Amino acid sequence: MTIINHTLGFPRVGLRRELKKAQESYWAGNATREELLAVGRELRARHWEQQKQAGVDLLPVGDFAWYDHVLTTSLLLGNVPARHQNKDGSIDIDTLFRIGRGRAPTGEPAAAAEMTKWFNTNYHYMVPEFVKGQQFKLSWTQLLDEVDEALALGHKIKPVLLGPVTYLWLGKVKGEPFDRLTLLNTILPVYQQVLAELAKRGIDWVQIDEPALVLELPPAWLEAFQPAYDALQGQVKLLLTTYFEGVSDNLATIAALPVQGLHVDLVHGKDDVAELHNRLPADWLLSAGLINGRNVWRADLTEKYAQIKDLVGKRELWVASSCSLLHSPIDLSVETRLDAEVKSWFAFALQKCGELALLRDALNSGDTAAITEWSAPIQARRHSTRVHNAEVEKRLAAITAQDSQRASPYEVRAQAQRQRFNLPKWPTTTIGSFPQTTEIRGLRLDFKKGNLDASHYRTGIAEHIKQAIVEQERLGLDVLVHGEAERNDMVEYFGEHLDGFIFTQNGWVQSYGSRCVKPPVVIGDVSRPQAITVDWAKYAQSLTAKPVKGMLTGPVTILCWSFPREDVSRETIAKQIALALRDEVADLEAAGIGIIQIDEPALREGLPLKRSDWDAYLQWGVEAFRLNAAVAKDDTQIHTHMCYCEFNDIMDSIAALDADVITIETSRSDMELLESFEAFEYPNEIGPGVYDIHSPNVPSVEWIEALLKKAAQRIPVERLWVNPDCGLKTRGWPETRAALANMVQAARNLRQSA
């Protein structure tokens, strides 16, 4: 039995972020729809050919998306919320963009769908909305069209389809409550129709993604897989595909399904290969996810070979990426500025395709020379002085319980802070960033390229900070921010100023829609050589009598939004970052900054997928935050910000952070999230986001007032703040001014009516 390889998906955005640029040009009215579609076709053709040239045997088709693949599935099924529908009932690409962004070049603007994280990654999807009695029909043929494209190019392909049970699991009920699982029988005919169309095209294998199978599912959801796959069997071979964790807990259910193969993540899961082999039907294909699709590190192929070699000849075997390569940058070869030694430690998506080819060849031939040579730099890294810092390791070992405790309880601190700041009821603020204009980005780029000296750069940034302060004063905000003109990204900026991180030139990965991020890479022990944010915070504070927040990104978020080391635990990395940022808090405080925000939007997304593993993670995640913050004096107010969160199942840990103020993203969920804080009787102050910054739509004063009144039904007014959902970096100034003016007016109206 010859072993072949495949990938579960490939990055969509293009090496130079061509997709992002085409999308934004189309949205701005500077490109036609056909020009946008042409960019998509060109990228798909390029990426299939690149994977093929790198040695991939079976290419994924259907992994491309114009916004996100869950939203693509919603359109496939005809699941379009009423507010986003075209008047004639048709579905087009603007329908998709209205769901994702709230507006598109055609059609009426409407509130965008809710967005949340894809499992425990930094990728996002638009949450499907379900209503009672909903009907589904095949309405969007993107998958079939792309299969036709790939077949016309002569490729050997494997269509990729998000499975029906996971799709329903990822959605939310709107309107009258009901069990969304009851919709399963309604969507299965559409899946049957799609599989029949694929069979007509001569497709042999379909990758049907059911990552919900790695979760500890409620019994009814686990039981739903059997009737679902009974209905889908027979037309093509189905590769049931899981990732991000192991499947051993649900293996009995999986092994009974009428599918022909199973893909397992052998990087992030703890599944034993021998147990998988023994418990799966003998005629099933096993796809072994051996190459990590979520990082940038070169794989130790000798280790991967040893992990799987005993199955060679015993069953049909494929080798694969652990998950879609969507989560990895595209091509290491264009990184011309990386130090040669460090570069030898990495592999991006195309290099991971090459690793799959090397591993396939070694398993088929038994010759391990090539994989041994490939793995040599990994051995060298384990002993590199770039990786280990004795001082950091010594400080980490000396941490005591007292280091993560504030000097006084919240009640005492709150009184000291009220005396210091004397803020009104319904105090208004923003989350941190202001619009990153073309001028600001150009300034940073010129400085980075050496076209601008440090003095002129600092003068330019200072002017933008001054403008941000003036704008906020004019709007009447109560607590100001400096606007973060000097920051390209909330994680990248800190990584650039901390030892132990390195950066790529083109290591972009998709976050959602057209938004891409370039995560730093943690290559060694983390420390802070000098103050990072103090000078700009101090300058901003000198421009106003109102308090200006110091702005830090928290240790767990920096960890979650970076590519972490694989040779130490995530806990170790988080606590190293926390110690570095603890020093920053002390320096900000010494510089006269009285309010310091430590953003932890990623705290919840870092949760292990299996609930049984949550407690250990939350314990060290909370400890890292407290270690970062606890150095602050009583009258220094510590804020934190979180987004895309469902808090009800981690409220103990949210409270344990002991932040004086937490700001959260609530507008898309219509303040639903506050129910968790009310039920828990959350003791500290809360700023529920009152408008969605991911949409360019400007909320009315009445809309914001209504949301704040809802909030006041759940949280005492004296503990409520007024703020947007998130930072305003991606918005333009006109809509930002208009939205904030309405927000401030809403707060004033409520003060007057109290």
Swiss-Prot record:
Zn(2+) binds at H641, C643, E665, C726. It comes from Klebsiella pneumoniae subsp. pneumoniae (strain ATCC 700721 / MGH 78578). InterPro entries: Cbl-indep_Met_Synth_N, Cobalamin-indep_Met_synthase, Met_Synth_C/arc, UROD/MetE-like_sf. Its EC number is 2.1.1.14. Keywords: Amino-acid biosynthesis, Metal-binding, Methionine biosynthesis, Methyltransferase, Repeat, Transferase, Zinc. This is 5-methyltetrahydropteroyltriglutamate--homocysteine methyltransferase. It catalyses: 5-methyltetrahydropteroyltri-L-glutamate + L-homocysteine = tetrahydropteroyltri-L-glutamate + L-methionine. Its cofactor is Zn(2+). The keyword Repeat applies. Binds 1 zinc ion per subunit. Pathway: Amino-acid biosynthesis; L-methionine biosynthesis via de novo pathway; L-methionine from L-homocysteine (MetE route): step 1/1. It is an enzyme of class 2 (transferase). One of its GO terms (molecular function) is zinc ion binding. L-methionine binds at I431, G432, S433, E484, D599. L-homocysteine binds at I431, G432, S433, E484, D599. Catalyzes the transfer of a methyl group from 5-methyltetrahydrofolate to homocysteine resulting in methionine formation. 5-methyltetrahydropteroyltri-L-glutamate binds at R17, E18, L19, K20, K117, R515, C516, W561, E605.
